[in-house]
Amino acid sequence: MRKITLIRNRRAGKAVYGQLSFEMRNREYALETFSMPSLENADYLIPAGTYPVERTWSPRFKKFLPLIENVPDRDGIRIHRGTIPEHSKGCILLDLAGMSNITILFNQLENEEENAQIDIVEEFTA
């Protein structure tokens, strides 16, 4: 099972930033992340914990994307590219600056026979 880790470490207004990392072929990859509330998900942060991740078809994006499952009182939470709050409805957005790492992650999830899991950790500094 592929393990993905998200460490949330910085707040700026309502936005929450972090670093998403995963290992592939003994090499660590990292991506900057961004989460922002929306009208549909005012209580938007996924609680810290471990969640299964499946690659499923997204009708909104019209392609396969990672879907985080078993989030309490939430559904449809995905990991996808984005740079502004309007790109998210409570999802984990990946910074486009890390485009090659995003492609590696998505390709790896696509080619995995097993699903992945994500560990979400909070390490905010005062």
Model-inferred region functions:
Residues 1-116, 121-126:
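Cell wall/extracellular polymer interaction/catalysis modules
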